[in-house]
Amino acid sequence: MVGFILTGHGQFAPGLASAIAMVAGDQPAFTVVPFEGDQAASYGEDLRAAITAMREECDGVLVFTDLLGGTPFNQAMMIAQ
């Protein structure tokens, strides 16, 4: 199974996850890591921890972000390398 991590600025990720749950129900191997201003200092560590945990239980991990070139995208790319 492939794991999915949804991340983005502000309430983008939790809001989209809520819509997905309403339409498709709870999904296995799916987690949300929001990037909010008051948690900016720990965001990279939080995302890395989520990816590491997902790798332990899944065959692969896809990280979905809101903006190409934004902090969530850039952090995910740095972790992937």
Regions found by a protein language model. Name each.
Residues 1-81:
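N-terminal loops that bind phosphate or other acidic moieties
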